[in-house]
Amino acid sequence: MTRIVLFLLTNLAVMLIFSLILFLTGIQSNTIYGLLIMSGLFGFSGSILSLILSKWIALRSVNGEIITHPRNEVESWLINTVRQQSIQKGIIMPQIAVYHATDINAFATGARRNSALIAVSTGLLENMTHHEAEAVIAHEISHIANGDMITMTLVQGVVNTFVIFISRFLSQIISNVMSSNRNENNTEEKNSFVYFLVSTFLELIFGILASIITMWFSRHREFYADASSAKMVGREKMIAALNRLKTSHEPQESDSMIAFCINGKSKSFLKLFASHPSLENRIEALYNQEYM
């Protein structure tokens, strides 16, 4: 219920901002041109802002601590491994963070491939061998080197744009049809209310359907990162790491972060909405040398 209320309030706030910007710029939202500009502007703005703030958001969400100077042998090994793999992939060494969590997990984020962050859980450092952890780090380094965070932002921005555009285009048609069949006072106010309700409903429905596209891309990102890691450190190490993930506790990271983690929630109610392939499918893909 809380999420629905927040969604409605957010949608109302976005509509008010839409109206203000369109009024100040002189763009008419009831034209295809104006609606497309509006949709693109707000479709990409949220994704781009999230990307820019991704490191800050990620660290706060897991309460991570950036490691600048190693405090023990494990952290020394971690820093050296990240440094060597960064050189291997031709990127500037990302910042390294450790966060307390019992699950075996790690993620990479950042707005640019040469200004990124890799975070690993204490559960990973405590429960994985060096060979397994090396493969996980290579997986995250591959995400950075491949520019997956930026690509994901572009995909999400395009999807958001189409969701907003189609929803509001259809809402305008529906509200116009309904108003043409009425001969009442305050038609304009009622028309705006109908437009708001219809657009909110359509954005919710199309947003759910659009997430199928972004989750499909997210799953394929994982396959390619697994394959890239296998090329870097060896297929056996990557397979061993994935097998180790089977013994992990359920991921504790927030829903907003889980898509960036190596150990995601693949057991979704519908596989179409899962951010990660199953560990079995990922292992099978490595055995069959797919995506390599």
Swiss-Prot record:
The transmembrane segments are 4-24, 32-52, 147-167, 193-213
One GO molecular function term of this record is: metalloendopeptidase activity
Major site of localization recorded for this protein: membrane
Top EC class for this record: hydrolase
Alphabetical keyword list = Cell membrane, Hydrolase, Membrane, Metal-binding, Metalloprotease, Protease, Stress response, Transmembrane, Transmembrane helix, Zinc
Location of this chain's protein in the cell: Cell membrane
Comment on bound cofactor: Binds 1 zinc ion per subunit.
Xref: Pfam families:
Peptidase_M48
Q: Which family does it belong to?
A: Belongs to the peptidase M48B family.
Name of the protein: Protease HtpX
Task: Report the source organism.
Answer: Buchnera aphidicola subsp. Acyrthosiphon pisum (strain Tuc7)
